[in-house]
Structures are given as structure tokens and as C-alpha cells.
Amino acid sequence: MVPRNDPEAGRPPLAPRLFSRFSQLSKHSFLSYSSSFEADDERSSTGSLENFGIMSPGRSRSNSGSGSSSFGALPPRYPGDDTRPTSPKELAGWYAYAFAAEVYVICGSFIPILLESLARENGVLLSDRKTPCGSSSDKNGDNGGQCIVYVLGMEINTASFAMYTFSISVLIQALLVVSISCAADHGNYRKKLLLAFGWIGSIAVMLYIFVSKNLYIFGALLAIVSNTSFGASFVLLNSFLPLLVRHHPEIIDKEANIVPNGQDAQDHEDLDGETAMADSTAALLPRGSLEDGNALSRVQTREELTSHELNLSTQVSAKGIGIGYIAGLFLQCVAIFILIQMKNTTWSQRVVLFVIGAWWAIFTVPAAMWLRPRPGPPLPASSRHTGIRAFIAYTFYAWKSLFRTVQLARRLVDIMLFLGGWFLLSDAIATTSSTAILFAKTQLHMEPWALGMINVISTAAGITGAFSWSYISRRLHLQAHQTILACIALFEIIPLYGLLGYLPFVKNWGVFGLQQPWEMYPLAAVYGFVLGGLSGYCRSLYGELIPPGSEAAFYALYAITDKGSSVFGPAIVGAIIDASGEIRPAFWFLAAIVGLPAPLIWCINVERGRSEGEKLAEVIEGFKVTRSPERESDEESRAILDVYDEETDR
């Protein structure tokens, strides 16, 4: 670095080679895409002069409105990178899949209800192992005894049958998510896999129409397939979120207006071709431009841009959650109408699930039409294989990448803090929902239509929460992680309220502490309102911490943490039910698992995590940024990379 007092410091750089840009163009071919890369009618070339630095940011923005979507885009990071600005139609495609698939989560409570009903129809009382069990909605139907069913020669409580089924499904889901993460991050597979899993899951849900009393094991298999497909598809959907935000026109404009010295780019007028060549040797540019080694660095304005991206990501994520909840609320009302009209039989529950699957399949079509594939960098090994060999190569590389991603994540403090908290929090969310539904059905003896009303209230509150938490956080000046902490505090009310039933004086009242069916409804409102905030804020917060270029790989780690933890929660609750014969003791476990994530979330620093992620992105395949010698020699910037290089060289 040249000292400030050196007389050579004020000397301008040598005149650039006037036609070196065009010489560079001769070494590259313009990017072209087949129709499989395009979203409906948006088939504009992504190869532009602006990608090679010929057009200034100001001009590219002015031209973006004239019809070429490539102008104003960020420069490509790898061959085939789709750098077109995010369009309203592409966002609509992303929202469309949330509208299609979120109904599975919201209406999916009918699956454990149906599984418990089918298991109970095949079960016997534990007291004599001969007497058939009655309906769980009948307070006297089981004579107060536990009901068990034989599965593969093992005795299982019918209330825990669904819990074990979902534990198995999330275990398989975690393995599947790892295997497909590489195909999603590399090449043009992200969208294809999303649609494939969407339609596989929807068909599995529709097949419940054929599940009768004697096919309850088949019903459990369908639950595993549908839940696995749903989880895999949402990992792929979530991996689109950072890309949609990164290429959003608002972010591109913010990026173009930022220079390293913090001044607005509009303060420096673009030079025309002849003027620029005539004055190329004159020291007319500010010192910041002369010393700039990286046109995309945001040294003094990183916090502002990070905050803007996080806000936009939160808005898009929350809107997607809200749209999905609206779809679920409508379908819940339809489901309750079907249950009432068909007398609350298992047949009516199967019809409801068929409608849910059909909804999922039909509304996936708009996502297929409008969502762009946004391909990732090509995998070098895949060029040598085709067909099944290519799939094996992708799978092998995916598992190898997982261990590398874990190594990378270990160097990102805020990623590790978030994943640790999310491991516990996601388990609490999934386990609380299924435990509450089974508690209402088996302990409070609520009818299926009444259980449907729980979901309606929860969904309506979720819609309110999805659109209200952003206002609450702005009003109270809360950061993203502080909003998550507020949601956790409200969430803790649910298990603590269930534990009130153990207090002798509350038990003598015969009300409060979940002793009456109506008490489920206000708790459902709390659960929905909390989930509306957690779903959007956790997803967007994590997206801001991910190193650019590895969205699917890190969202696979996110899903493994999410779904992998859900293996333990339902299994532990199932073991508690088998040991105690009732569900209420499980609230002790839920109270602990809801509160434990709070200290980890509190320690997250978004700005620090974003900075570390960008530094680490340099060693992840498919992402390279040219840095100035000054920045390359900076010890702080190289600290993470040096440690990683040492590990990979071993």
C-alpha cells in the first residue's frame, strides 16, 4: 500500500487499454438458455454488455425499463448464472407454491387423527389384550383403559402410533434432503426437483382415499412419503429465497448506488465513450475510485445494505407464509363442512385428505409456469456421467459437500448459534402441534370437526401473525433475533398452561390447565400467532447468514437441523405416552424444549454473520470475487479461509 505522503500517491494510474473490454468479450460466449431455464414468457438473454463492465450501473438501470431484463443485473458469478432481476411473475411463482403446499402443514393434522383412528379400530385394550377399543371421541368407549395395536409384532399405544410414524418420516426426509442438495445447488435441477417432490407428495395424500381399516400400515407409509416429499420440496423452495432477494431490483439499485467510500454513485456522472478515452490519463476521479480494488465491496455501508436485504427477505418470507395460511384457512373451512356433512367418519377424513392432496397438485402448476430455475454452478464431475451415473455422482458429491458444509458452518459463529437454537425450536414447533391434537382427541375426547376448528383458529391467528410481527418489530424497534425471542416467550405459555392441570386446586376447579375442550381454542390462537412470526423471521434471518452461492447446501443443513431434531421430539413424546399411559406428562418435555433455544438466539449478530459468510464464500465452489492486494493481505479477512484451507489439505 502506498503511503499517503508519498509523492507518487497522487499520480493517476496508467491509461487503460482502450479496447481491452472488447478483447475480453472475444474470450467469452454470450450465455444462452433453452426454454427449460425460462419462466413462462420471460425469455430474454442474460448475456449483456453490462455483465462485462461495458455499461455503467446508471445506464443499466435506465435501460432496464426499456425491455431488457438483463440490464441492471448483477454480474454473473459462474457460467450459466441467471442474473436477471427478480420479476413480479417470478415472485408470484414462489408464492404460488406456498399457496399450494402450505395446506399440507395446516390441514395435515388430519393425518395423525386418521392414523390414530385406524390404529384404534385395529387395537385392543391393554388390560386383557382381547377387547376391541372403542372410539377415542367416546369418553366411555375404551372403559378408561389404554388401547394398543400390534405393529411388526410390537405393542404400541394407538396414541403414539402417529408420533412414531412421523419420527420415521423426518429421519428419511433428512437423509433425502442431503442427497438432493447438491443437485439443487449445481446445474438446472432446483426447480425440477421442487416440482417432482410437490407432485409426489400430493399424490400420496390423495391416495388416502383408498386407505381402509385393514390398510392402516399403508396409511402410515403414505404419511412417510407425503411428509418426506413436503419437507424436501420446501427445502428447495427456501433455497430460492436468498436468490430472489439478491436479484431483486431494489437490492440491485442499492448495490449500484454504493461505493467503498460511502458516497452515492449518482454523485459521479458516467463518462461517454469519447470523453472517457480522451480523459483517461487525467486525475479527475476521486481517490476512493483509484484505490478501489473491488467494485462490489461495501466497506463503510455494509450495515445499511444488510439491513435492507434482511427487511426485504423478511417481507417476502412473511408474505409467503401469510399466503399459505390463507389457503389453509379456506381449506380448513371446506374440511369442517365435509366432516359435518359426512358424520365425522374415517371415510370423511379420507375425503378431506384427498381434497388437500388435489389442492396441492393443482396449485403447483402456476409455480411450474412462473418460477425461474435459477441454476447453480455446474458440477465438474457431472459432465462425465449421464442418467443414473450422474445421479449417483450428485448424491456422492452431496454427502461429501455436507461434511464440507458442516466444516464451513463450524467457522461461522452465528450460523452455529442459529442452527443450535433452530434444532430445539423446530422440534418444539412440530412436537407441540401433534401432541396437542392427540391430547385433544384422546384426553379431551373432541370430535374431528372440533379438531378442525382448532386448526381454523390457529390458521387465522397465523395469518394475523405473519402480517403483524413485522409491524410489531418496527413499532418496538426490535431486531430480527429479538422478534424471534418475543415469539418464544409467547410460545412458552402453551406447555406451561398444560402443566397447570397438575396443580391440586386447579384440578379441583375442573377448568383451566386443559381440562375442558374449549381451552384448546385460545391456545390454538397463541400457537398460530407465534408460528406466523417464527416461520418468516427464522427463514429470512438464516438466509442472511448463508454464504452466497451455497443456498441449497446450507438450507439442506437447515432442513436437517429442522427435521432431524423432529425425529427426537415425537419419539420422546411417544415413549412418555407408552410409559405413563397419558399425554399430559409430555408437557414437561415441551416446556423445556421451547425455552432452551432463547439463549442461543439472543447471541446472534446478523452483521457479523453476514460478513463472515461473504468471506467464506470465496472458498465455496462457484463463487469467486476479485479482491485488491490490500484486502487479500488483511489478516482478519483471511482468518476463516486459512483455517479451512488447513483442514482440506489434510
UniProtKB/Swiss-Prot annotation:
<dbReference type="InterPro" id="IPR044738">
    <property type="entry name" value="Atg22"/>
</dbReference>
<comment type="function">
    <text>Vacuolar effluxer which mediate the efflux of amino acids resulting from autophagic degradation. The release of autophagic amino acids allows the maintenance of protein synthesis and viability during nitrogen starvation.</text>
</comment>
<dbReference type="GO" id="GO:0005774">
    <property type="term" value="C:vacuolar membrane"/>
</dbReference>
<feature type="transmembrane region" description="Helical">
    <location>
        <begin position="351"/>
        <end position="371"/>
    </location>
</feature>
<dbReference type="Pfam" id="PF11700">
    <property type="entry name" value="ATG22"/>
</dbReference>
<feature type="region of interest" description="Disordered">
    <location>
        <begin position="628"/>
        <end position="650"/>
    </location>
</feature>
<dbReference type="InterPro" id="IPR036259">
    <property type="entry name" value="MFS_trans_sf"/>
</dbReference>
<dbReference type="InterPro" id="IPR050495">
    <property type="entry name" value="ATG22/LtaA_families"/>
</dbReference>
<feature type="transmembrane region" description="Helical">
    <location>
        <begin position="217"/>
        <end position="237"/>
    </location>
</feature>
<keyword id="KW-0812">Transmembrane</keyword>
<feature type="glycosylation site" description="N-linked (GlcNAc...) asparagine">
    <location>
        <position position="344"/>
    </location>
</feature>
<dbReference type="GO" id="GO:0006914">
    <property type="term" value="P:autophagy"/>
</dbReference>
<feature type="transmembrane region" description="Helical">
    <location>
        <begin position="320"/>
        <end position="340"/>
    </location>
</feature>
<feature type="transmembrane region" description="Helical">
    <location>
        <begin position="557"/>
        <end position="577"/>
    </location>
</feature>
<dbReference type="InterPro" id="IPR024671">
    <property type="entry name" value="Atg22-like"/>
</dbReference>
<feature type="region of interest" description="Disordered">
    <location>
        <begin position="36"/>
        <end position="85"/>
    </location>
</feature>
<feature type="transmembrane region" description="Helical">
    <location>
        <begin position="586"/>
        <end position="606"/>
    </location>
</feature>
<feature type="compositionally biased region" description="Low complexity">
    <location>
        <begin position="56"/>
        <end position="72"/>
    </location>
</feature>
<keyword id="KW-0072">Autophagy</keyword>
<keyword id="KW-0472">Membrane</keyword>
<feature type="transmembrane region" description="Helical">
    <location>
        <begin position="160"/>
        <end position="180"/>
    </location>
</feature>
<keyword id="KW-0325">Glycoprotein</keyword>
<dbReference type="GO" id="GO:0032974">
    <property type="term" value="P:amino acid transmembrane export from vacuole"/>
</dbReference>
<feature type="compositionally biased region" description="Basic and acidic residues">
    <location>
        <begin position="628"/>
        <end position="639"/>
    </location>
</feature>
<feature type="transmembrane region" description="Helical">
    <location>
        <begin position="518"/>
        <end position="538"/>
    </location>
</feature>
<keyword id="KW-1133">Transmembrane helix</keyword>
<feature type="transmembrane region" description="Helical">
    <location>
        <begin position="484"/>
        <end position="504"/>
    </location>
</feature>
<keyword id="KW-0813">Transport</keyword>
<feature type="transmembrane region" description="Helical">
    <location>
        <begin position="193"/>
        <end position="213"/>
    </location>
</feature>
<feature type="glycosylation site" description="N-linked (GlcNAc...) asparagine">
    <location>
        <position position="311"/>
    </location>
</feature>
<feature type="transmembrane region" description="Helical">
    <location>
        <begin position="412"/>
        <end position="432"/>
    </location>
</feature>
<keyword id="KW-0926">Vacuole</keyword>
<comment type="similarity">
    <text>Belongs to the ATG22 family.</text>
</comment>
<protein>
    <recommendedName>
        <fullName>Autophagy-related protein 22</fullName>
    </recommendedName>
</protein>
<feature type="transmembrane region" description="Helical">
    <location>
        <begin position="449"/>
        <end position="469"/>
    </location>
</feature>
<feature type="transmembrane region" description="Helical">
    <location>
        <begin position="95"/>
        <end position="115"/>
    </location>
</feature>
<keyword id="KW-0029">Amino-acid transport</keyword>
